[in-house]
Amino acid sequence: MKFFVDTANLAQIKEAAELGILDGCTTNPSLMAKEGIVGQKNVWEHYKKICEIVDGDVSAEVIATDYKGMLDEGKKLAKLHKNIVVKVPMIREGVKAIKYFSDHGIKTNCTLIFSPGQAILAAKAGATYLSPFIGRLDDINSDGIELIHQIRHIYDNYQFKTQILAASVRNALHIVKCAEAGADVVTCPLNSIVGLFYHPLTDKGLAQFLADHEKANKK
């Protein structure tokens, strides 16, 4: 399973990359705004900075919602760096755009997936990735992890090549559950990845080892 970090914060991206387990990065307009990155020129320059840090795919989202606009914007984004993946919303015009990009060798991430039917459409159009939003489904008392199971089953049935990129992942347990469900990729904040390191028995065991070592060396 691949780990992507879901942020536009360069310091956090660097920290994630330094762990040695980072495979990519996802961003969206909200994350860019959170970092105070405004204006197309500044946003696109920021994408380039992210690509300099991350040795892997970087999702950059189109703002346009019409077919022509998405094509124009997506083509320009793809030219920024070889690792750019054009992120396209799950709407009718978006699926058409994904098909075009797929036919022309441009990687895509179909975002805002909330149902198995949407996942089928994304795969049929040739999306490189699709992003089911786990946490947002949980927020409305639906089952985000179950959606991953459903998509995995469908994709395995028909040998679809689209990678399941679990998004809206809120914590370390979500990551593990996504892995169990067969997600190809999990994208999440840095603190969720870091949360995987910790277990009270690991801390207790290490403390005991160090205490025993110190005691033995005092003799």
Residue ranges, per PLM feature:
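Active-site beta->alpha loop and helix N-cap motifs at the rims of alpha/beta catalytic domains
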Residues: 3-5, 9-13, 19-21, 27-100, ...
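Catalytic cores of alpha/beta
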Residues: 11-19, 69-73, 97, 115-125, ...
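Glycine-enriched alpha-helix->loop->beta-strand junction motifs that scaffold or abut catalytic
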Residues: 20-24, 80-84, 100-109, 124-131, ...
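Glycine-rich phosphate-binding active-site loops on the catalytic face of alpha/beta enzymes
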Residues: 29-33, 112, 128-140, 183-202
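Alpha-helix-loop-beta-strand connector modules within alpha/beta enzyme cores
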Residues: 44-58, 95-108, 144-164, 207-219
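A contiguous pocket-lining binding segment that forms or flanks enzyme active sites
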Residues: 111-165
